[in-house]
Each structure stands twice: as structure tokens, then as C-alpha cells.
Amino acid sequence: MAVPGVRLLTGALRKPDAWTRLWGVIQGTSSHKLCASWNRYLYFSSTKLNTSNYKTLFRNIFSLRLPELLVSPECYFPFSIRLKSNINSKKSTKKTLQKEADEEDSDEETSYPERSEQEEELESEPGVAKDYKDLEKVVQSFRYDVILKTGLDVGRNKVEDAFYKGELRLNGEKLWKKSRTVKVGDTLDLITGENKETGTEVVMRILLKKVYEEKTENDKHRVVLRRWKSLKLPKKTLSK
């Protein structure tokens, strides 16, 4: 019989008018004449109270009217209230904080890309000068004259004149046919000067570094050309 009585009391005390009548009985005044302090209690009862607010309300009532009665808050507050909105709010906040922590961990674990193979190959050739430039170009074919003209940004006539003067080299050897097909890794040299005292020749060099598998809409080849505009090399490497 005690449990149904507690439930009935709990349901009744949740209504604001019940608190009004209860306060009138305790104060010995009419329920319509509310004192200033009652406004605070009415505010608590008309809003969504949590457990701590209910305990505070009971404690204030008993301390005002019955100060000699020392009752533990657990005694005059035998029931508990589960506030779903507060629980959901705490869960949502916890998930948000966990998500932010995961994103920070992901950012810290992100590794930076390693150096390209081109840079590694260049460092493995200590005798090759570093004053080069990599260019992405589009070519119709892999003919020697086409690759050299595109890489050096020179006219076709200049390439033909250099060919007839014997100033073109392919991998250090004299070029005998300007329409010869080149492949990745081949070097194309155009001799621009000679130093007899040092036994060196100055060349403009093109290296076919890479060929992309995907072609353009016009069915042309996309390539990467490495260009040296002025490179000094021993003459013997060009005069085989």
C-alpha cells in the first residue's frame, strides 16, 4: 500500500495548483495570496525540473516552516525522475567530442607524400647538373625532331639546320635520322657551343622522362620532358 501512495503523491505534486494549496496550508494563508518567495517555487514547478531542483524545493519548504525537523533530502524525495532530454543531450555532446577527437587523430596520422622517383633518380646521378626544368607537353608522335622541337620551344627549321650540320645527338651518339623514334629515358642533345681548352661542349638537352597512358581528346600523347638549356659535357661523350 505504501508504493501506490508514493506514486499518487508524486503525480499530485507535479501539478502547480497542488503546490499552491500545499503552500497555503504550510503558511496558514489563502492559496490566492502568494508571498514573494512563492513565485520562485512556482517557477520551479512550472518548468522542466530536474532532480536537484526538486530537492532544493523540498529543502526550502521544510526549512522555512519546520526548521526543527532535520530530514535527509532522500527521505522527503523518495522518487527519482529520468530526464530523457538531458540524457540525449549528454549523449549527443559525447558523440560530438569523440568525433572531433577522431578527426584530430586522423589529421595527425596523415603522412606526407614521399619524394618522386624523378628526384631520387636525379640524386643518384651526381655528375648531372641540377639546373633543369620539368615540362608537361602534348606531342603528336615520338619522333626525334618532334620531341626536341617541343621541349626546346624552337622552330622546325632550327632543328633541321642543326641536323644537317651534325649538331644533334641521341644518347651521346650522332643522329643519322631525324625521324627516329625515341622512348622514355632517351636524351636528345643540340650542340650550341664548344670549348677547346677544356675539351667540353655546351648543349641544350631534352630527356623524355614520362609518357602518360591517357591521351588527349585529339588522340595526342601527354609527356613530361626535362630540359637543360645550357649543359657542359665532355666532348668525347658526344662524338662517338
Swiss-Prot record:
Residues 101-124 have a biased composition (Acidic residues). The modification Phosphoserine is found at residues 106, 116. It comes from the Eukaryota. It is found in: Mitochondrion matrix. One of its GO terms (molecular function) is tRNA binding. Residues 92-127 are annotated as: Disordered. Residues 1-83 form a transit peptide. The keyword Nuclease does not apply. GO terms for cellular component: mitochondrial matrix; mitochondrion. Residues 142-217 form the S4 RNA-binding domain. Keywords: Mitochondrion, Phosphoprotein, Transcription, Transcription regulation, Transit peptide. GO terms for biological process: regulation of mitochondrial transcription; rescue of stalled ribosome. Monomer. Interacts with POLRMT. Interacts (via S4 domain) with MTRFR (via C-terminus). Associates with mitoribosomal S39 large subunit, peptidyl tRNA and nascent chain. Mitochondrial RNA-binding protein involved in mitochondrial transcription regulation. Functions as a protective factor to maintain proper mitochondrial RNA level during stress. Acts at the transcription level and its protective function depends on its RNA binding ability. Part of a mitoribosome-associated quality control pathway that prevents aberrant translation by responding to interruptions during elongation. As heterodimer with MTRF, ejects the unfinished nascent chain and peptidyl transfer RNA (tRNA), respectively, from stalled ribosomes. This is Mitochondrial transcription rescue factor 1. It comes from Mus musculus. The gene is Mtres1.
